[in-house]
Amino acid sequence: MQGGGQRGFRAVDTDPSDVFDAHLAASQGVEPGVDLVVWPEDVVDVEGPVGGTDEGEALARVATATGATLVVGVIEGAGRDRFRNAAVAWGPDGRIVDRFEKVHRVPFGEYVPGRAVFDAVADLSAVPRDAIPGTGPGMLRTPAADVGVLVSYEVFFADRARGGVRAGGRLLLVPTNAASYSTSQVPTQQVATARLRAIETGRDLVQAAPTGYSAVIDHRGRLRDRSALGERAVLHTTVTLRDGRTLYVRAGDAPVVAAALAAVAGAWAPARRRPGRGRRATR
């Protein structure tokens, strides 16, 4: 699901209700009979838990109207200075069935390390609040399937995808948001990285972004569908739910680390055995 709109604007300069309304409108294009609808990251902005808000009620209606599981990227304010960045799932009956809160936050984007120090020497108005980090693997257990979740920036961390699959994820979802970037560089980088995550884990992957790129990638990393930047789009596709585990899911980075250590040891050992040049023994 991609609501579309202008790109190159900071979140603090964007009206959250406009973004939300755009995705509500786009949801009218969902075809009957779908099992799962995925909205992007940060397209709903509320104070406190989303379930008791007007936006939450509207999302429940979308889920019941489509008869599908609905996964939405939600920003929940937690007081004046903090917030949660969550992927929340509604079942076809309109009830919240699960949620995952983003673990890997973007430094100087979602929080400011050492805020008290930087606040004295810099303007931090573009990052007025700090995200509260989540815990555990990215996983949502839903009526449609158990799905691994990588919220935006987390797609760049292979261990997050591995953790979601090891926890039972049969499909990977990447709700993301690159609307603040005016060029195609970051959206392109995100899709390329998502393709790598799909190959590593052997899972089909669905990425949703408010202004692109939204994409569908198969378990071999092949790009099956992709939106254009800035457009309103609904990508309809069929994905395969998978259960097997690739070598990377089973072993993680251990084989690569072992190979690197072996290469270093192999290069070092001959140097240790090589006799010194230009030396002669005397008695």
Identify what each model region corresponds to.
Residues 1-283:
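Enzyme catalytic cores with a strong preference for nitrogen-chemistry domains
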